[in-house]
Structures are given as C-alpha cells and as structure tokens.
C-alpha cells in the first residue's frame, strides 16, 4: 500500500515539476555570451545553434531547421509518451470499475484497491512513469528554445518570406497556421482514445484559440517556431501513432471477437439440437 501511495505521490509531483520549471525559467532579461547563469548559457547555446543554421543569414531558416532538429531528437521520447498515454486511456474503464468495487474509505479497502490497480497495470504492461519521463525531458528543451527566440537580440532581427521576425505578422497568416496545426495535433492525439477526456476535448479548441490570439502580439519568430513544431507533431502522429490505423485495428479486433462469440453460440445451439 505504501509503495502504491508513494507512486501516486511521485506522479503528482512530476506533474507539477514542468509548471515549476516554466515559472523558474521564464526570465525576461536579455541573454548574452556573458550571462552567468547555467540556464541562460543553455538558452544562448540554442541561439548560437539557430544562428549557425541560418543559411544566407536567414534567421527564419535557422529557426525552422533547429526546431526540426530538436523535434527529431525528441521523437523517441514523444513516441513513448503517446503510447503510454494511450495505454493509460485504454484501461480507464477497468480502473473505474475497480474504484466502484472498492469504494470504501477504510484502510483494508484502499489497500485492496491499490493491489488490484497494480495487478491491472501489470496485466496490460502499463507503467505510470512512462509518460512522465519524456515530458520532464522535453519541457526544459522546449522552454530554452522558446527563450532563445525571445531573449537573444540577434535572433530578433531579419525577415522570412513576408514577415519581420521581430514584429507580429501583419497578414496574420502565421498565427492562423500555428492555430491550425495546434488544433490538428491535439485533435489527432485525442482521436484514438477509447473514452474522451472532457478536459482534453476542451483543450482541442481552447489551445488553438490561445495560440491564435497570442500570435497577434508576439514576434513572428516565436510564432514560426510554434507553427513548425506543431506541424512536425502532426506528421509524427500520422506516421508513428496514426489514430486512424489505431481505430481501424481496434474495430477489426472487435469484429473478430464478435465473430468468435457468434461461432461459439452457433456451436452451442448445434450441440443442444444433437442432444
């Protein structure tokens, strides 16, 4: 029981860590080569990498290439996170049945619920930590990349296609693209879930709207990063965790199970007639 409670406690802490990290890391001062903190040095390192990838001096190209590089490096972790989250979603109905079965608040009932829950995790090969580790690794990387675009002066200059990277997009095309790809990535992530989480369903529509309206006032370099990052995530989902294939496979297995039960009923009827 103590082990299970410790696991649940650690999961709650792990969920808070990214938010704490975000609040701690969100400095506003300009970052230079002389910045003293380790975090600022990481941000500056990212900025120099973007500058190095800026072929023909195009910071926009550098932002795109560096964002793609980071997303490619994090792809295995993202894939692990998605698969683990899908497994957790799949067993939610059974977990709720256990919670109904052991609804008592006494210690013995809670211990029994914990034991049954652990047995369920083991049965389906679900590790509650599996979806947390990738998130904890991705968060500081993505925050450092975001801050490189907002706190390092030489990344705030230049143009890319029709936009000034230091200014908002006067045509509002980048905010629209960022919102569209944000919607697609969250929608595809939630599409294959057996049971729709209300909060996730709300976020499918809230997140794109937030990105869209924030894109009105933010520098176009930041919005370009959002657009490329979410577009990459859409492609990654379709290639590695295609929800349409998952749904089709789930339906195929359900049909096979239905056919199996139908054959069993027919076999029993034939056996009864022979008697």
UniProtKB/Swiss-Prot annotation:
The principal localisation class reads membrane
Q: How would you describe this protein's topology in the membrane?
A: Multi-pass membrane protein
Q: Where is the signal peptide?
A: 1-25
| Membrane-crossing residue ranges in chain numbering | 58-78, 129-149, 170-191, 198-216, 222-240
* Lipid-linked residues (S-diacylglycerol cysteine): 26
- What cellular component terms from Gene Ontology apply here? plasma membrane
Q: What compartments host this protein?
A: Cell membrane
Q: Any keyword Manganese?
A: no
Lipid group attachment sites (N-palmitoyl cysteine): 26
Q: What CDD domains does UniProt report for this protein, alphabetically?
A: 5TM_YidC_Alb3
Q: What biological-process GO terms show up in the record?
A: protein insertion into membrane; protein transport
Query: Which Pfam families did the record assign?
Result: 60KD_IMP
MF annotations from Gene Ontology:
membrane insertase activity
The UniProt keyword set, sorted, is: Cell membrane, Chaperone, Lipoprotein, Membrane, Palmitate, Protein transport, Signal, Transmembrane, Transmembrane helix, Transport
Write down the InterPro entries for this protein, in alphabetical order: YidC/ALB3/OXA1/COX18 (IPR001708), YidC/Oxa/ALB_C (IPR028055), YidC/YidC1/YidC2_Firmicutes (IPR023060), YidC_ALB_C (IPR047196)
Function, as annotated: Required for the insertion and/or proper folding and/or complex formation of integral membrane proteins into the membrane. Involved in integration of membrane proteins that insert both dependently and independently of the Sec translocase complex, as well as at least some lipoproteins.
Which family, according to UniProt?
Belongs to the OXA1/ALB3/YidC family. Type 2 subfamily.
The protein depicted here goes by the name Membrane protein insertase YidC 1
Quote the gene name from the UniProt entry: yidC1
């Amino acid at each position: 029981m103590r082990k299970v409670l410790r696991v649940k406690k650690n999961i709650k802490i792990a969920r808070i860590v990214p938010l704490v990290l975000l609040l701690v890391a969100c400095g506003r001062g300009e970052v230079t080569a002389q910045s003293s903190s380790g975090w600022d040095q990481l941000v500056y390192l990212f900025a120099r990498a973007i500058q190095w990838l800026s072929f023909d001096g195009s910071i926009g190209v550098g932002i795109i290439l560096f964002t793609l590089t980071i997303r490619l490096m994090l792809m295995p972790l993202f894939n692990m996170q998605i698969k683990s989250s899908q497994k957790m979603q799949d067993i939610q109905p059974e977990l709720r049945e256990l919670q109904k079965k052991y609804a008592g608040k006494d210690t013995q009932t809670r211990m029994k619920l914990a034991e049954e829950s652990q047995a369920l995790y083991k049965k389906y090969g679900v590790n509650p930590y599996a979806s947390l580790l990738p998130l904890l690794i991705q968060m500081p990387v993505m925050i450092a990349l975001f801050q490189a675009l907002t706190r390092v002066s030489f990344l705030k200059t230049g143009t890319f296609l029709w936009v000034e990277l230091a200014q908002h997009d006067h045509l509002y095309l980048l905010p629209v693209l960022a919102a569209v790809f944000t919607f697609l990535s969250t929608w595809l992530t939630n599409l294959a879930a057996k049971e729709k989480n209300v909060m996730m369903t709300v976020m499918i529509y809230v997140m794109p709207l937030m990105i869209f309206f924030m894109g009105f006032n933010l520098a176009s370099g930041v919005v370009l990063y959002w657009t490329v990052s979410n577009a990459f995530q859409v492609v990654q989902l379709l290639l590695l965790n295609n929800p349409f294939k998952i749904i089709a496979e789930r339906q195929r297995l359900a049909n096979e199970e239905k056919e199996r039960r139908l054959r069993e009923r027919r076999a029993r009827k034939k056996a009864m007639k022979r008697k």
